[in-house]
């Protein structure tokens, strides 16, 4: 199993030339929260062309600063500051629905355990809008009319250092219908070792044990 995991890691780390590694597609698992409901409606600017959570206005807009989510804090919990300890409103990792109750907001977290990743690109289509954070740091927000289309919103996440990273998303809708499309890729991605993989120090001890066992067998044979 250990050798198999190493082979998989190498294949993901050094893909065939010109081929990106696909990390997430629309149906892939993430943590999901659909308990926000309409608690954010008309906050952060109201039903205006520059409002973050309108009820009717379908204007195209972008948001350089993060929204105030205090009216949904009970639903979201510490999702931006402590994603390792989500409250009971969050699902376990499961396939993310590509639509939700119209006129409400939902939140998603994708977790990446990696030994390093390069040129991570995230492409989204959302009806109507979205807000994104990486490890709790706000990246961008935007809204556009019409249905979801691939590449509607594109995020250049750059390189990820070794460790666990969280891409936190809030999807906005203000009625009618909605939809969600995602495709996240990297030029290279080395998965973080699963819990069953021994630490390097343990491997050294294991190797020393095998060497000692071999010497004992040689002495007995002599």
Which role fits each region the language model picked out?
Residues 5-14, 207-209:
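Sec-dependent N-terminal signal peptides
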Residues 16-20:
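Sec/Tat signal peptide C-region and signal peptidase I cleavage site
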Residues 21-91, 95, 111, 166-195:
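Accessory carbohydrate-binding/adhesion or oligomerization-edge regions at the termini
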Residues 94-106, 142-148:
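Extracellular beta-rich ligand/substrate-recognition surface
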Residues 114, 118-131, 167:
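Aromatic-lined ligand-binding clefts that engage carbohydrates, nucleic acids, or primary amines
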Residues 131-185:
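Beta-strand-rich ligand-recognition modules
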């Amino acid at each position: 199993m250990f050798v198999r995991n190493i082979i998989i890691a190498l294949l993901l780390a050094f893909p065939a030339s010109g081929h990106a590694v696909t990390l997430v597609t629309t149906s892939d698992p993430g943590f999901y929260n659909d308990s926000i409901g309409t608690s954010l409606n008309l906050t952060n600017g109201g039903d205006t062309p520059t409002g973050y959570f309108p009820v009717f206005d379908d204007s195209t807009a972008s948001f350089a600063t993060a929204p105030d989510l205090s009216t949904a804090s009970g639903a979201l919990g510490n999702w931006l500051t402590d994603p390792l300890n989500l409250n009971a409103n969050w699902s376990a990792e499961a396939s993310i629905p590509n639509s939700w109750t119209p006129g409400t907001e939902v939140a998603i977290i994708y977790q990446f355990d990696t030994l390093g990743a390069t040129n991570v690109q995230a492409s989204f289509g959302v009806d109507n809008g979205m807000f994104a954070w990486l490890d709790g740091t706000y990246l961008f927000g935007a809204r556009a009319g019409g249905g979801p289309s691939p590449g509607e919103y594109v995020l250049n996440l750059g390189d990820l250092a070794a460790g666990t990273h969280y891409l936190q998303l809030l999807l906005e809708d203000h009625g009618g219908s909605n939809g969600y499309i995602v495709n996240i890729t990297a030029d290279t991605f080395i998965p973080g070792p699963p819990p069953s993989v021994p630490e390097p120090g343990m491997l050294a001890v294991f190797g020393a044990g095998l060497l000692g066992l071999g010497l004992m067998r040689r002495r007995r044979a002599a």
